[in-house]
């Protein structure tokens, strides 16, 4: 199902999030449960894992997010690399010891398995089918942890990630996956000779992205790439890519050239309307007094309960203005979604993260 299809009563742009949240509980038991959940083991750890993932997903839905990502409490790199055979984790990073393949029983992301298993509950509580965003860490970002990588590293990672997305797309009457995002926060951030123009690495990375997103498109599900910088234009060449998103202050959202790219390549934007760097949010409140010590002092007061983290969140009006500016600049037909610029794992509390999502939803509906 396309995210651009909507009932007459719905808004033109749908709210979404990027995935991560602060974990409110005991992380060691939770992480143990994540590794055991899809193996069908029933114990305290898997019960906690299912409970926390289901609760957080429902909280996102109740906050008004129309296309919530699965709640991401685990490390975005380790949750994928730990599922692979043919790798050895060394002090300097991951070293390939053979052909990369998925470990038996690790094809399904446990977070997605929880959501599918609890689909009846979500449908009952919300009174309508849910839509889900599945995020996978991309081959470029994962390969950054390989000290001895070459262009074939992208190829191998692209192949196994294609298998992952294939196994994690589902559609049932209670809900369905409507968006798969390839998260590449490191792409374009630093100069990388391996992907210079004209290199095999550049072509192999493009082919890896195409492999992953092409597999998704065959399931009639929309695709997205999550970036932090868009100065390197390679991503525009992915034919199976549908939606582009980046950070609030990325030139992508300001440049006239972006509209040309969107129209020539027939792609959509996700408007990033909420800043997720909490240090930056504090500094914006402090203004001229935003020294490092002052920011650290605010964090201490939040931790002690003296200050509420919600007082540092951006207001609905600012989020709405960012969305309006993006729509005015590129046309409502090119802005499929609006949401946070990145994950909310760096927020001080779980509650402040959910409040941020509620404001994003309100800004989108207004």
What role is predicted for each listed range?
Residues 102-124, 200-220, 357-366:
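Alpha-helix-loop-beta-strand connector modules within alpha/beta enzyme cores
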Residues 14-26, 32, 39, 44, ...:
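Hydrophobic faces of well-ordered beta-strands that scaffold small-molecule active sites
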Residues 53-64, 111-128, 162-177, 256-264, ...:
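Short amphipathic alpha-helices and their capping/turn segments at secondary-structure boundaries
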Residues 127-134, 146-281:
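Active-site loop segments of alpha/beta catalytic cores
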Residues 242-366:
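Catalytic-face loop-and-helix region of soluble metabolic enzyme cores
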Residues 85-170:
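Active-site-proximal, glycine-rich beta->alpha crossover segments in alpha/beta enzymes
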Residues 41-46, 87-104, 145-158, 191-204, ...:
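Glycine-rich tight-turn/loop motif centered on a GG-T
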Residues 1-87, 154, 220-222, 326-328, ...:
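N-terminal basic, low-complexity leaders that serve as flexible interaction/assembly modules and, when applicable
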């Amino acid at each position: 199902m396309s995210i651009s299809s909507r009932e007459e009563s719905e808004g033109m742009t749908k709210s979404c999030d990027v995935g991560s949240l602060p974990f409110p509980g005991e992380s060691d038991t939770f992480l143990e449960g994540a590794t055991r959940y899809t193996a069908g083991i029933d114990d305290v750890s898997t019960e906690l894992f299912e409970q926390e993932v289901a609760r957080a997903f429902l909280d996102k839905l109740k906050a008004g997010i129309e296309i919530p990502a699965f709640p991401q409490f685990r490390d975005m790199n380790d949750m994928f690399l730990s599922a692979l055979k043919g790798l050895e984790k060394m002090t300097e990073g991951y070293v390939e010891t053979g052909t990369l393949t998925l470990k038996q029983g690790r094809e399904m992301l446990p977070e997605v398995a929880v959501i599918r298993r609890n689909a009846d509950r979500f449908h009952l509580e919300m009174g309508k089918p849910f839509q889900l965003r599945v995020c996978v860490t991309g081959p470029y970002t994962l390969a950054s942890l390989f000290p001895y990588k070459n262009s074939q590293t992208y190829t191998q990672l692209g192949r196994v990630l294609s298998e992952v997305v294939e196994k994690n797309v589902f559609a049932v009457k209670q809900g369905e996956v409507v968006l798969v995002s390839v998260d590449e926060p490191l792409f374009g951030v630093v100069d990388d000779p391996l992907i210079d123009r004209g290199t095999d690495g550049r072509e192999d990375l493009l082919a890896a992205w195409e492999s992953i997103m092409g597999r998704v498109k065959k399931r009639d599900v929309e695709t997205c790439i999550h970036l932090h910088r868009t100065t390197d234009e390679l991503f525009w060449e992915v034919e199976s890519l549908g939606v582009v998103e980046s950070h609030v202050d990325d030139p992508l959202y300001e440049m006239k050239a972006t509209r040309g790219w969107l129209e020539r390549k027939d792609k959509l934007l996700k408007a990033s309307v909420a800043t997720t760097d909490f240090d930056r949010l504090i500094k914006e409140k402090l203004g001229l007094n935003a020294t490092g010590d002052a920011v650290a002092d605010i964090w201490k007061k939040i931790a002690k309960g003296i200050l509420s983290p919600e007082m540092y969140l951006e207001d609905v009006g600012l989020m709405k203005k960012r969305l309006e500016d993006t729509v005015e600049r590129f046309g409502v037909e090119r802005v499929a979604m609006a949401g946070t610029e990145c994950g909310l794992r760096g927020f001080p509390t779980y509650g402040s993260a959910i409040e941020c999502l509620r404001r994003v939803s309100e800004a989108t509906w207004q």
